[in-house]
Amino acid sequence: MTESEARSIITDYYLAESHSADDKFLFVEAQHFLIDAFHDPVDMHNLAWFYAEERNFGLYRKYLEMAAECGFLPAFESLGYFWYYGESGTVDYGKAFYCFGRGAESRDDYLRIGCEYKIADMYRYGYFVEKDEARYKEMIERLHDEISHPENLVTIMSSEFLPDPGLCYRLAEIRADEGRIPEAMKLLRKARTQFAQYLHDNPSWWGNIDEMESVVMMMHDLSLNWDGDIDLYDLFWLSVNKNTMSFRYNGVRFTVECLEEGRNIVIRFNNKWYRDLHSFFEKAKIGGRPITAIYEELTDYEVA
């Protein structure tokens, strides 16, 4: 394999909506070739995130730590999440705080903000540091103000790495607690639109599904008499009452059934079963295309 061939394989992988087992094998081989040949921490970090999407957290950690040893600050942000959420089975808030702190030293504003807003979460919940709700709110207000003026931010990263929707969701919680419901709903609509775009662009990343669920459920909690348009992601709310949703894609009607199985809700769609909604959003496809990638092409929603 040559460098040109390896980079071509990687580019094609990132541009594809879905990946076969062969695609994944070639991607890993290409990344290994580049890492062995050039020792670039960017390639190490990219391979780490491949393993995160595959939920292989042992190899995820291995390549993050390899990149961090090279001083690559984005790897510290990722390690912060690794320890914060205990993706290896062990939560370590001390290591998470250290890693987010290292990432926050970056002169790239997207990376700095991404780390600072997780540090804010740690002050909110008292993880490793003394709980400080006032400091949390001040940090979220400040960071949201920063991202509201993107022309002032210095970055080489793409927009998906700015935690804009996550900050909108947190500020919406603050506004809702203040009784400023219209402002909270406006922030939630923005967060929902952005998470939908993230899931369109990267259907493999399950973390955005978790965030989308929080946004949708809060929107419905704040609007007891829901008068907004229904779309695919309202399944999070509809599934609570075991509703059925249908929609059209290319003129054909499809149905998503939320069915009770013991204490759980399972999903039946297109003659396949999914253990829960998260599995559905991760794996469901129509004609080989991920359901989240064709979200904007779905029309004529009905609920029963």
Briefly describe each language-model feature range:
Residues 19-22, 53-58, 69, 87-91, ...:
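Short coil/turn and helix-start
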Residues 112-125, 152-167, 199-224:
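TPR/TPR-like alpha-solenoid helical repeat scaffolds
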Residues 37-41, 70-73, 85-87, 106-112, ...:
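Short helix-capping/linker turns of helical repeat alpha-solenoids
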Residues 2, 6-9, 44, 76, ...:
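TPR repeat positional signature
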Residues 12-13, 46-53, 80-85, 116-125, ...:
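Hydrophobic face of amphipathic alpha-helices that form TPR/SEL1-like repeat modules
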Residues 39, 71, 92, 111, ...:
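Structural signature of alpha-solenoid helical repeat junctions
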